[in-house]
C-alpha cells in the first residue's frame, strides 16, 4: 500500500503440504509468506472447515479495507470425512473464526467426551490439517483431558482471542 499507493484485495489459494504426491506437486512455503509479514500488510490463513474457508473469502470481499489474503489449501482436507460444516455454519449469523476450539465441545459430535475445562490437563495448539491427525490420535488413546485448539489465522496473529480461550483452562 505505502509503496504503490494502492490497496489490493488479491486472494492467493496455495497448495500446502507435499502429502506424498511426489516432486512434480508444489507446496507453498508457509514460512516464506510469514517472513514477508510486517505491519499487518497481508493476511495469512490456514482454514480447517469449509465454513471458515467460506467466511474468510466473504470477509475479504465485504471489508471496508483491502489487504492481500494468502490461503493455505491442503488437498487432503477435500477428502477428509471429519472436515465438514453444517449448513447453519455458512449463514450470516456466523463469521470467520481466527481460532477454533475443539470439535469435541460441539453438542452432538461423535467424539470423545472431554472433561470440564478446569480439569483439562493439556492444551495442544496447531494449525491446518495436523488437527485431524491429532484428533485421531486422541481418539485412539481415549485421552479426555487433552483439548486441541486450531489457529486459523496465522497473520495478523490472534493473540487476544487465543488468550481469552486459554484463560478457561486453569491447569
Task: Give the positions of each predicted feature.
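Conserved thiamine diphosphate
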Residues: 1-118, 132
Amino acid at each position: 500500500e505505502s509503496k504503490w499507493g494502492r490497496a489490493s484485495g488479491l486472494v492467493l489459494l496455495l497448495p500446502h503440504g507435499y502429502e506424498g504426491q511426489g516432486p512434480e506437486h508444489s507446496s507453498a512455503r508457509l514460512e516464506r509468506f510469514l517472513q514477508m509479514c510486517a505491519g499487518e500488510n497481508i493476511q495469512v490463513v490456514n482454514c480447517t472447515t469449509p465454513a471458515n474457508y467460506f467466511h474468510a473469502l466473504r470477509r475479504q470481499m465485504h471489508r471496508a479495507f483491502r489487504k492481500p489474503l494468502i490461503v493455505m489449501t491442503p488437498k487432503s482436507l477435500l477428502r477428509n470425512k471429519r472436515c465438514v460444516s453444517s449448513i447453519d455454519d455458512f449463514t450470516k449469523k456466523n463469521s470467520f473464526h481466527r481460532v477454533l476450539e475443539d470439535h469435541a465441545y460441539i453438542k452432538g459430535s461423535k467424539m470423545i467426551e472431554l472433561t470440564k475445562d478446569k480439569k483439562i490437563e493439556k492444551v495442544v495448539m496447531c494449525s491446518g490439517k495436523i488437527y485431524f491427525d491429532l484428533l485421531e490420535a486422541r481418539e485412539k488413546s481415549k485421552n479426555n483431558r487433552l483439548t486441541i485448539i486450531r489457529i486459523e489465522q496465522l497473520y495478523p496473529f490472534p493473540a487476544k482471542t487465543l488468550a481469552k480461550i486459554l484463560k478457561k483452562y486453569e491447569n
